[in-house]
Every structure is written in C-alpha cells, then in structure tokens.
Amino acid sequence: MDLAELARQTAREIAEGKAVIFLGVGASVGTESERIEGKGVLSSGELTRAIAEHFGVDLQYDGGGELVSTLRGVASRAVLKRGPSTVKRFVIKRIRSGCGKPLRVHRALARVAPTIVMTTNYDDLYETAMQEAGKDCRRIVQSSDLVGLPLNRPRMLKLHGDKEQPHEIELTGSDYMAWRKRAAGLQAEVVAALQKHVCVRRLQRARRELGRRTKDHLREP
C-alpha cells in the first residue's frame, strides 16, 4: 500500500467512525521549514534542556553525546528544588510562545474534523485550527467535561492536561502515577463513546439502506 492509498483509507475510516486521531508532540513541533519561520512548540528534548538550565538540574548524556535524561525525570528533580507549581508554570510559559499559530498538520486535520481527537500535548494548535475553519471543538480535560456533550460534537481529549490549567498538567513521575488511576475513568468513557458512535453510524447506514431497498421494492412492477 502506498502513502496515497493509506491516506485515503485513513480518511475513510475516520469518516466512518472506525479510527481516532492521536496527536503526539511531533505534531506540534512542526516541520523544518515551519521551525525556521518560528512556528511550533518546543520538542520534549528542548523542554528538558530548558528546565534543566533554569532550575539547575544536571543532564545525562550517553557516550555519543545524545541526551539520556527524560523530560519526566528532569521535571521531577526540578520540582524537588522549586515545587510543582513553579516548574509547571515555567513549562507552560515556554509552550505558550508557540500557541495560537496552527501548523499545516493541524489545518489539514481541521478540514477533516473527526469527531474525536486525542493528544498528550498541552498546546492549543488543533483547537485554533478548528476555530479558523469555523468549526466547533470542545476541549476535554477531565471526565466531567463530557457531561451533556452531544455525541457527534467534535472534541479534543487533552490526556495530559491543557495550558489553561498549568497546575494540573501531567509532567513529573508522581503526576503520571496519579494520572494512571484518574485516566482509567476517562478512558472507559471514551471507549463507550466510540462504541456508541460506531453503533449510531451503523444504524444510520442501515436506515439509509432500508430506505433505498424499500423505494426499489415499491418501483418494482
């Protein structure tokens, strides 16, 4: 299967409610040309180095000079020095500089506007792209945000938090341990929503097919 066919298949599956888009940090970092234009947010490696430099945390490198220290590990050590609120505000401040300016990947996805998009990113690039396209997109940060949300309304599930709530982002080792417990409920609701969404789509297709066959039957002599 070539790339073009893969893209067509993916688009079909999204339209049919069989696939969910997941955006990792790579989606918000941007291409080389976009980075040259000053667009995109910091990569995890860049953010790791920024935290280490600002809070005086030593970094570890392998024999080839590659960074071994992780964002989670460095952030955890920084929190021991200055506290979680200070470190998280610093992280979001560095992220904000790249917010509000969607990249090509976000604008392309907004044209498709799948019902559910999931991400571990803190930024608002996809939501902004949806706004620019004149489309509504509800930001889901916790399970309570799903209450009363219409089934077919586009939503962005922010699995690790959002820049508008800096103190609640998942960043350190202890954050992720607690998140695993909290996320179980959200994941269960997402799965249920997906199953319901697929069932509704199938029911709609069945109704259309039944209507078509009924019309064909009535036309028969």
What are these regions (language model features)?
Residues 1-19, 101-102, 107, 111-221:
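Conserved catalytic alpha/beta core of Sir2/sirtuin-type deacylases, generalized to analogous enzyme cores
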Residues 1-118, 123-134:
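Gly/serine-rich nucleotide phosphate-binding loop at the start of the catalytic core
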